[in-house]
Amino acid sequence: MTNVVIDTKPVWGNMLPQLKWKDGTVVISEDDKHNEPYGIGKFFNFKEDFTRLYFKAIVNNPRERKTIEALISLPRSVADVCNPGGVYLGGRTLVDNVAKKFATIKASVDANGKVGYDTSDLERLGVRCRYYVDDLVKDDALMRRILLENKWKSKYPALVKPYEEYQRSKPKTIVLPTNRNNPVRSNVDIKPVNPPSSKVVKTVETDERLKDPPHTGALKTLIPLQKPIAPVQISEKPVVVKPEIKSPSKVIQTPDPQTVVAGKIIPNNESADSRSLFGSPVLLICVASLLLLIIIL
């Protein structure tokens, strides 16, 4: 497995776990090329483990006056700079023969108030970390820092090919057309099973036991797809067949409607004998006279 040794940029906070710091002053210079003081700042809220540091600097110069505040997270040890995935190989972490109680820090302040920290009267610290290539290319945070350098390929040539292979092997999100809301992570391309054609055929591979002796490969039969026939549903309950008895229908004859002409009833020829008895006016007069006589007596 290939190893890559990376010289990280100096981080002034690496010295804090090994130096007994208290509240002290900081000399801020305008940039790395100038040594004249740009402002005076002060450290506040030191903790024994030096993992969090509140830094407040008041910048005084003829052109501007501003207050810079920053909350800095510091590593517990120098070896934490190489984590995760790295092995600390050493480097200058302490300055020999430091007579001052408080180290002097210089920084460059831009127009927006951002401060870039660096050691001033101390020699630049080079922290060397060893990484395994397979683990290094998977460390997104560290790779982002390496990729910021324009000449990272020439500086770390052993990283080029493994990093490109890792990028190609990353799983990609494929959204199936059948369900757009369901992302499926896959490393292979999804292709249709049957290519589009005018005739849709289905390839069926026969069983090995059905092969003819002369043939060496499995038989392949082309069966055209047909529409499935709907099965006939058979009821499990017994069907009772009742014989149908036809009864003679009764014919109900209704009298034909009578024809009315000018207020007179013209009887039909078919019902003439049924109305002949009561249709005579002489008989009606006799019956009426008999009834009247009975009432009088």
Curated annotation (Swiss-Prot):
Residues 175-199 are annotated as: Disordered. Keywords: Glycoprotein, Membrane, Transmembrane, Transmembrane helix. Belongs to the ascovirus HvAV ORF18 family. The keyword Transmembrane applies. GO terms for cellular component: membrane. The chain crosses the membrane at residues 277-297. It is found in: Membrane. Residues 176-185 have a biased composition (Polar residues). Its main location: membrane. This is Uncharacterized protein ORF18. Glycans are attached at N269. It comes from Heliothis virescens ascovirus 3e (HvAV-3e). It is a single-pass membrane protein.
